[in-house]
Amino acid sequence: VAELAAFAKERGILFHTDAVQAAGHIPIDVRSLPVDALSLSGHKLYGPKGIGVLYLRRGTAIAPLIEGGAQERELRAGTENVPGIVGLGCAAELAAAELPEEMRRLAGLRDALMDGLLTIDGAWINGSRTQRLPGNLSFGIAGLDAESLLIRLDLAGFAVSAGSACSAGSLEPSQVLTAMGQPPAQAGSAIRVTLGRFTTADETAAFLAAVRSIAGTRKDK
């Protein structure tokens, strides 16, 4: 992101980054990150739903979202969600205080889960093993499409995803994975797993066992 932002800045291009998935999970420092704007969402770091943040670097001008009042520096009229703002602030403080330890814990669970998944015949990991969020992984298994694996894991009690909430309902393979060079068949088989603050080693072991059991039912294995 820093390299892209610097590239844009050299050319006079305004640069915004969506940090919704990053906030509370990896360090974010807008003093060293050369972005003009950054957004995040409270519920992604265990704060209240319905509250978020838009950071604008000093001197960055944008048009008002809602006119008619002076709230939020005249960018969005209407009474502010004060309880939500306070809740988000508390969540951010807690996340920052626990961040180094939680990053290590989640990365350990993630790496163990990736290693286990790769022992399943036909399994692969999408993306880098290390250049990713500590609690994030994306995988696929040959002979299992994402939808069927998603349903069977749901029946087994595991909530995973075949894409982002922004692409919910789309039957097309992930644009991100295809942009990364994944063939359509592999991109269409991808399952995203997110580990969180309350995820335990026992739960990741149970998830791995469920995936292994489902993979064992493939007709073409």
Features from the language model and the residues they span:
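Pyridoxal 5′-phosphate
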Residues: 1-221
